Amino acid sequence: MLPRVTKLNSRLLSLALLGIQIARGAITYQHPDDLPSGVDYDFIVAGGGTAGLVVASRLSENSNWKVLVIEAGPSNKDAFVTRVPGLASTLGAGSPIDWNYTTIPQDGLDGRSLDYPRAKILGGCSTHNGMVYTRGSKDDWNSWAGIIGDQGLGWDSILPAIKKAEKFTQDFTDQSVKGHIDPSVHGFDGKLSVSAAYSNISFNDLLFETTKELNAEFPFKLDMNDGKPIGLGWTQYTIDNHAERSSSATSYLESTGDNVHVLVNTLVTRVLSASGNGTDFRKVEFAVDANSPKKQLEAKKEVIVAGGVIASPQILMNSGIGERKVLQAVGIDTLIDNPSVGKNLSDQGATSVMFDTTLPSTDFDVDAALTEWTNSHTGPLARGARLNHLTFVRLPDDKLNGQDPSSGKNSPHIEFQFAQITPQVPTLGVPKQAPLPAANSYRLLLQLAVVNLYSISRGSISLSDNNPFTYPLIDLNMFKEDIDIAILREGIRSAGRMFSSKAFKNSVNKFVYPPADATSDEDLDAFLRSSTFSYVHGVGTLSMSPKGASWGVVNPDFKVKGTSGLRVVDASVIPHAPAAHTQLPVYAFAEYASALIAKSYN
């Protein structure tokens, strides 16, 4: 979760409107009129985000195939700020490279509407997220495999593919890395750069002392990506060995040949039947904006929709694929009647808690740090989040009201992500009503994002009209189920135990948010309804299901049910949120889909 754009962000985004093409082979076009005539594309990918660029890159490995990617946002090359790891928190809602969605008012959140950041730039959310690299638990993958009916997505089957895609960049004997990860669970020859966090501040020693005192609740975890993430350990990031963000745009697209064409600043509005009235959806319609002419192109083989958890169901519904009564209400003719389209939105609810401490601030001069990074790719902006640790907590059974929404016993219910709050670069979705430190503060104001990894409330994406340029209605249905608020309540109490430990006795003064006297269930629930936000890890709006199932939108081969020539590959097909930040699962699903597609054409 990232906050609204800051003055710093606006200044940085204006630094480097470079206007250069993607390096190496892929060819970028800024306007539909610039596309070359007479080119027959084998595959057209609707959306140049995390998944879309993986698919385009992998399919382009067959030099006989031509691939077109159509992306609504600009090239990532035009946004210098996205390259700098330490400035990730300045992106998101309010940014010119974000869609700037908001949800409808949430009944469970005192009627509040929430920001719902989604990237509008080449590389998608891998270009503007927090870069955290987590795989989830092996239970998540086995759960998905069982739901979908494809054991190829089970943990033991998918792990080699995950490792194949990864390029871990650090020397394991380096003291800044040694003891932070387990080399045996990583890959070294893939496209996506991954590195372990490092920092040398007093907070680290205190935090890891809690793994001794409170080992049952916060055991030390060497590597959270081994399939059993429960515990406290070091964060891993998609940052390369030059201290730059690694995204699908930088790691996959930049290694393609010239058989990939990329059209930016252009929205895919619909997929169309190639015959005009059938179920063979191999044609796309696209336009620059609502007032510009719409153009069409037909793929020789397939159209692959990769717009993400919000845009992909919007594209399908505008194309006549969805629930008949919903489409009729906005004047869209139904071609494929499927009530599952846009349903099953699974996301992670989160809140921020803050502690006043006597620890020294890790704040720094942003301008000086930016100069250092620009000159040498070193300094505080060469890293990801300010405090480089994650904790995954599994709650005891007696705190779950007789329910266990997790994927299994290896799976946590809660995540803590740590940060320092500063006036210059706020992080992790600091609520507007939360206290912020003074600009001259020399003490660390510690923040934890407390995340419910397995919210069982399900939301939806729907249309308000039949204009593809109108934003869809996003309903998270937050706290529809009581267990979701109960888990966050227990997460706050767990955080309190961590920072009331002996290790922090002389360093942490008190809760400042929520107030220290908010201890009852009723007080904490009121706090949560007023402060909870989305961690923006939504999945499931075009959920995958077994072939022949009466529910779901795509089959295990990623083909849209009832159609030919049309697949969906992105977060929308994942049945439920994992115990993870979702970028790695999206990469893995995209790698898996790419192999299936290529194999289907031998």
UniProtKB/Swiss-Prot annotation:
One of its GO terms (cellular component) is extracellular region. Its cofactor is FAD. InterPro entries: FAD/NAD-bd_sf, GMC_OxRdtase, GMC_OxRdtase_N, GMC_OxRtase_C. The modification Tele-8alpha-FAD histidine is found at residue 128. It is found in: Secreted. This is Pyranose dehydrogenase 1. Optimum temperature is 63 degrees Celsius with ferricenium ion (Fc(+)) as electron acceptor. It comes from Leucoagaricus meleagris.
